[in-house]
Protein backbone atom coordinates (compact mmCIF):
# COMPACT_ATOMS: atom_id res chain seq x y z
CA UNK A 1 0.00 0.00 0.00
CA UNK A 2 1.35 3.41 -0.98
CA UNK A 3 1.30 6.10 1.68
CA UNK A 4 1.83 9.84 1.39
CA UNK A 5 5.15 11.17 2.79
CA UNK A 6 6.98 14.46 2.99
CA UNK A 7 10.74 14.71 3.35
CA UNK A 8 12.73 17.85 4.05
CA UNK A 9 16.48 17.75 3.78
CA UNK A 10 19.21 20.36 3.96
CA UNK A 11 22.20 20.02 1.65
CA UNK A 12 25.69 21.37 2.30
CA UNK A 13 25.79 25.03 1.19
CA UNK A 14 29.10 24.77 -0.68
CA UNK A 15 27.80 22.31 -3.29
CA UNK A 16 27.53 23.74 -6.81
CA UNK A 17 24.18 23.80 -8.64
CA UNK A 18 25.02 20.74 -10.76
CA UNK A 19 25.95 18.60 -7.75
CA UNK A 20 22.85 19.80 -5.86
CA UNK A 21 20.57 18.79 -8.75
CA UNK A 22 22.27 15.39 -9.09
CA UNK A 23 21.66 14.68 -5.39
CA UNK A 24 17.98 15.68 -5.69
CA UNK A 25 17.62 13.45 -8.77
CA UNK A 26 19.38 10.56 -6.98
CA UNK A 27 16.86 10.58 -4.12
CA UNK A 28 13.94 11.06 -6.53
CA UNK A 29 15.20 8.15 -8.66
CA UNK A 30 15.53 5.91 -5.62
CA UNK A 31 11.86 6.50 -4.72
CA UNK A 32 10.68 5.84 -8.29
CA UNK A 33 12.90 2.76 -8.63
CA UNK A 34 11.20 1.25 -5.56
CA UNK A 35 7.75 1.76 -7.09
CA UNK A 36 6.97 5.11 -5.46
CA UNK A 37 5.80 8.34 -7.07
CA UNK A 38 7.24 11.80 -6.42
CA UNK A 39 4.34 14.27 -6.51
CA UNK A 40 6.14 17.54 -5.77
CA UNK A 41 9.67 18.92 -5.27
CA UNK A 42 10.17 22.37 -3.74
CA UNK A 43 13.64 23.85 -3.88
CA UNK A 44 13.71 26.55 -1.21
CA UNK A 45 17.33 27.43 -1.93
CA UNK A 46 19.95 28.62 0.54
CA UNK A 47 18.67 29.80 3.89
CA UNK A 48 20.37 30.87 7.07
CA UNK A 49 20.02 28.62 10.13
CA UNK A 50 18.74 29.94 13.45
CA UNK A 51 21.82 28.30 15.02
CA UNK A 52 24.95 26.51 13.82
CA UNK A 53 24.54 22.94 12.59
CA UNK A 54 27.76 20.97 12.07
CA UNK A 55 29.70 24.28 12.10
CA UNK A 56 27.60 25.65 9.22
CA UNK A 57 25.50 28.82 9.22
CA UNK A 58 23.35 28.08 6.13
CA UNK A 59 22.15 25.24 3.92
CA UNK A 60 20.21 24.44 0.73
CA UNK A 61 16.66 23.35 1.63
CA UNK A 62 14.66 20.82 -0.40
CA UNK A 63 11.11 19.59 0.35
CA UNK A 64 9.80 16.55 -1.52
CA UNK A 65 6.30 15.02 -1.37
CA UNK A 66 5.94 11.42 -2.50
CA UNK A 67 3.82 8.28 -2.34
CA UNK A 68 5.62 5.07 -1.46
CA UNK A 69 5.65 1.92 0.65
CA UNK A 70 6.84 2.17 4.25
CA UNK A 71 10.01 0.22 3.37
CA UNK A 72 10.89 2.78 0.69
CA UNK A 73 10.53 5.65 3.16
CA UNK A 74 12.74 3.80 5.65
CA UNK A 75 15.38 3.20 2.97
CA UNK A 76 15.28 6.88 1.95
CA UNK A 77 15.75 7.85 5.61
CA UNK A 78 18.78 5.53 5.82
CA UNK A 79 20.33 6.96 2.64
CA UNK A 80 19.82 10.53 3.83
CA UNK A 81 21.41 9.67 7.18
CA UNK A 82 24.60 8.24 5.65
CA UNK A 83 25.01 10.87 2.90
CA UNK A 84 27.86 13.30 3.63
CA UNK A 85 26.17 16.01 1.53
CA UNK A 86 23.02 16.07 3.71
CA UNK A 87 23.31 18.28 6.81
CA UNK A 88 19.86 17.47 8.31
CA UNK A 89 16.72 15.64 7.23
CA UNK A 90 13.29 14.52 8.39
CA UNK A 91 10.80 12.12 6.80
CA UNK A 92 7.16 12.52 7.84
CA UNK A 93 4.13 10.39 6.96
CA UNK A 94 1.25 12.71 6.11
CA UNK A 95 -2.17 11.98 7.59
CA UNK A 96 -5.19 11.46 5.37
UniProtKB/Swiss-Prot annotation:
It comes from the Bacteria. The keyword Ribosomal protein applies. GO terms for cellular component: cytoplasm; ribonucleoprotein complex; ribosome. GO terms for biological process: translation. One of its GO terms (molecular function) is small ribosomal subunit rRNA binding. The keyword RNA-binding applies. Keywords: Ribonucleoprotein, Ribosomal protein, RNA-binding, rRNA-binding. InterPro entries: Ribosomal_bS6, Ribosomal_bS6_sf, Ribosomal_S6_plastid/chlpt, Transl_elong_EF1B/ribsomal_bS6. It holds the Pfam family Ribosomal_S6. Binds together with bS18 to 16S ribosomal RNA. Belongs to the bacterial ribosomal protein bS6 family. PANTHER family: MITOCHONDRIAL 28S RIBOSOMAL PROTEIN S6 (PTHR21011), SMALL RIBOSOMAL SUBUNIT PROTEIN BS6M (PTHR21011:SF1). NCBIfam families: S6. This is Small ribosomal subunit protein bS6.
